[in-house]
Design a protein with these regions (language model features):
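Nuclease and nuclease-like effector domains acting on nucleic acids or nucleotide cofactors
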Residues: 3-121, 128-216
Length: 216
């Protein structure tokens, strides 16, 4: 009887331990601070968009992300909450972000882990234009503008380049599809594959684009 009790305790302990182990972080070629935490923000797809209907929504020139974009009140509230959760708590006033030459906010003045909301875009990891979920917190995170790779800014604006390029690869085979990228797509990928690239390693795709290669 004692042996059975000890075995049950052991099994329960192992189960609790396994439940606390976060999923393994996917291999990514860039530094960790340009990506969201894969546990908090793994990405989430829009259940209303699938491979069969992309011609009616994301690839349709008449369709716009404005139709499904969440209100600013929601994303601002979530951004404030997630900044705390992500540990972005280094105090920085708006005055510290002002460029004296222009009198405007200059995000290159943002320090690492700044608590100033102007230093971030509350971004969809899988973008709306690529079938991402509009409101699921697992698909949203405060993406910094001023993160760098080898001294080069690599943040929210650079990810925007990838988002449009992936969109055009997803829509490559759709007749009359809208174009979101100034860089022409050369191959067709599935909606699912495009979302995997964006959630997995958008920066690897950015490097491929920079070399004149497709993301696949």
């Amino acid at each position: 009887m004692k042996a059975r009790i000890l075995f049950a305790i052991l099994v329960a302990g192992v189960s609790i331990l396994l439940a606390r182990v976060p999923p393994a972080q996917p291999h990514r070629i860039g530094p960790a601070d340009i990506y969201p935490d894969p546990v908090r923000t793994p990405g989430a797809a829009n259940p209303q968009i699938n491979q069969e209907n992309i011609g009616d929504n994301i690839c349709n020139p008449q369709w716009s992300t404005k139709q499904i974009r969440p209100p600013a009140e929601y994303t601002s509230r979530l951004k404030r909450k997630q900044l705390r959760e992500y540990g972005d708590t280094v105090h920085q006033t708006r005055a510290e972000l002002i460029n004296p030459s222009t009198g405007k906010v200059d995000t290159t003045r943002c320090v690492a882990h700044s608590d100033n909301m102007a230093c971030y875009e509350e971004d969809h990891l899988i973008p709306l234009e690529d079938g991402g979920n509009p409101t699921d917190p697992k698909n949203l995170w405060p993406e910094a503008y001023n993160t760098r790779v080898g001294g080069t800014i690599m943040g929210a604006h650079q990810k925007d380049v990838v988002e449009g390029f992936i969109h055009d690869e997803i829509c490559y085979d759709i007749p009359g599809a809208k174009k979101n990228s100034y860089i022409p797509a050369t191959i067709s990928i599935t909606l699912k594959r495009g979302q995997q690239i964006l959630a997995g390693d958008w920066y690897a795709c950015y490097e491929s684009i920079r070399k004149g290669e497709p993301c696949k």
